[in-house]
Amino acid sequence: MKRLDKNILVARMGLEKESLRVDRRGRLAQTAHPFQEDVELDVDFSGNQLEFVTDVCDSADEVWEALRRLHRKAARVLEKRETGPEYLWPFSNPPYVQAEGENPPMEFYGEKAWKTAYRNHLRDRYGTQLMLYSGIHFNLSFPEKFWEAISAIGDAGIGTGCAGEKRRSADAAYLNLAAWTTRYAWLIVYLFAASPVLDESYFCPGKKDGTPCLKYASPRSSEIGYWNDFEPVLDYRSLEGYVDSILKYTKDGTLMSPAELYYPVRLKSAGLYDLERLRREGVSHIEIRIIDENPYSEIGIFREDVRFLHLLMVYLASRAPKPFPEGEQLLALRDMKCAALFDDSTCLSNGLSIRENAVQALQEMEEFFERGGGSTPEGGVAPVVGSAPEGVAAPLTGSAIGGGSANGDSPTSVGIAAPVTGSASDEWAYIREALDIS
């Protein structure tokens, strides 16, 4: 079997995680935001929502540890608040909502005053309830040596030449990765959905003893979640076209800001989300925005989850470029919403069930790493989805059936933990070493 080039696993990554603050009764905290001056604990739309932002890290384990450090830092402060202890709500879905407007928008001043106007716009257009959802964003950047390594075993990569040519080639590779990630967004939602219970007070604030909604495994990624009131179509043929296809929605008044485009994947330059900067400087990284918080993990995500996302991006980066026309884009987004349903026997656009599609996708991912020289753990990737315990739907399990261990490793063989756990061959041990996994 061919030896794997370790450069195929070189990447930089970061995590962002939103969390609502609640009091000891599990109600939304109404106290002032305690971390307004902390760059690691950002302020999002609501005063009772925190956003954890890790540094850029060189491995899945490192970024997971960075998020855990921030999580524990916040928990220590919240526990000792003078107004009474507060806690981080562990779900993507909000707790009981007593009244509309329980998540007061933050007020920003000076250079950040535009944020207040923008958030008021979101409140007026979408309502405050939508802003109660929380989730996790995964950011990943591949260096030049990765693209060179992936081109040797896959169907994509970057060419050689001057710096300008390499940048254009890298931008094209990221555009291809974004297109393929959008095509596979349904798989990410399916494997990471962890929010099957949504109290009816979300729809009718103040209603008590309402029957929880059980239709969705991930409401925030479903038709009732973070979506615009139109179906966006993007241009993946060039970076110029990609930027212009988003800006057209702001120029015609459909959106107030590019940030208002609720889409599962974003291409970004370094720093704040700025499309003109993206146009000038090129793509720095890709952001995946459709990950639910896993309530079985102390910080909302297991380290295996991050490893799997990394490996999935490696696999998708290897896929050959192909056109991504409007019709396919719309089907991809509809499939993603479909995968957010609790019933994974629902068929996607190709006529196969969500579960059948997932088994097939994971088999193809396994075969890719085997061709590249790395072999997957014993039992392979494909049986993962099919091996869920009787009566347990895979979207609910994720990597979390039975909970996780103190070091963040999930003890189960069910769900997304399986591709990177279990008994491993020498080649898989090599992959673990390249990922800096102890």
What role is predicted for each listed range?
Residues 299-321:
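C-terminal catalytic subdomain
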Residues 81-83, 182-197, 313-342:
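Flexible helix-coil linker/hinge segments at domain or subdomain boundaries
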Residues 1-123, 130-132:
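Terminal catalytic/cofactor-binding subdomain
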Residues 18, 130-143, 285-293:
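Histidine-centered divalent-metal-coordination microenvironment in nucleic-acid enzymes
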Residues 1-44, 327, 331-381, 386, ...:
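Sequence termini and other peripheral, non-core segments
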Residues 14-16, 47-49, 133-137, 176-178, ...:
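Extracellular structured ligand-interaction cores
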Residues 378-381, 385, 390-403, 408-409, ...:
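Intrinsically disordered, low-complexity tandem-repeat regions
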Residues 110-128, 132, 141-283, 298, ...:
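Loop-rich catalytic cores of soluble enzymes, especially ATP-dependent carboxylate-amine ligases
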